[in-house]
Regions:
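Conserved N-terminal glycine/acidic-rich loop preference
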Residues: 63-66, 110, 120
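A generic structural signal for alpha->beta connector loops
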Residues: 44, 95, 121-122
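Short extracytoplasmic
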Residues: 40-67
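Short active-site neighborhood of thiol/selenol oxidoreductases, capturing the structured segment around
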Residues: 57-80, 86
Length: 174
């Protein structure tokens, strides 16, 4: 009976260790949770242009186009870190439509940010109330999505993109 009492916690601990090792070897990144939107249709949205409130962009405007969607804000420091990379993407993939959604930001602050740092986007939409981000399941800024020509979300990245992430994860899909 004494042996059983001593061995039981050891067996439980060993079992927990085995499950932890199996999980760690499964190559799942806990910082990169799967998106429920992957391989789903692009959510329906309509957004006014940051620069011309009479111009509107809609989900239907992207039929047969590859689209990179980036949610950003002028007050978002990680957004500023990844910002220059969108210029490179724009130059390297001229057929790629890069849509920036300015999220819960002051319009004048957003315009100043893009005037100072440059505008790499094909179109900048306004998401002042956060409803478009909600449709995309945006958790925090920045977040980036890649949509294929069939209108399906094929890639999502939470956080600032880096050269390595673009080269290893995004480029193969472009």
């Amino acid at each position: 009976m004494k042996k059983f009492i001593i061995l039981t916690p050891l067996i439980v601990l060993l079992t927990i260790c085995v499950f932890c090792i199996i999980y760690l070897l499964s190559n799942k990144d806990p910082l990169k949770p799967p998106s429920a939107l992957l391989n789903k249709d692009l959510p329906l949205f309509e957004s006014k242009s940051l620069y011309d409130l009479d111009k509107v962009i809609k989900t239907n405007d992207f039929k047969n186009k590859k689209v990179l969607i980036n949610f950003f804000a002028s007050w978002c420091l990680p957004c500023k870190v990844e910002h220059p990379l969108f210029f490179t993407l724009s130059e390297d993939h001229q057929d790629l439509f890069i849509l920036g959604f300015n999220h819960k930001d002051n319009i004048e602050d957003a315009k100043k940010y893009l005037a100072d740092d440059g505008n790499p986007y094909s179109f900048v939409g306004i998401d002042s109330d956060g409803m478009i981000a909600l449709e995309f399941g945006v958790f925090g800024l920045p977040e980036t999505f890649l949509i294929n020509e069939d209108g399906k979300i094929i890639y999502k990245f939470m956080g600032p993109l880096t050269k390595e992430i673009i080269e290893n994860e995004l480029e193969p899909l472009l």
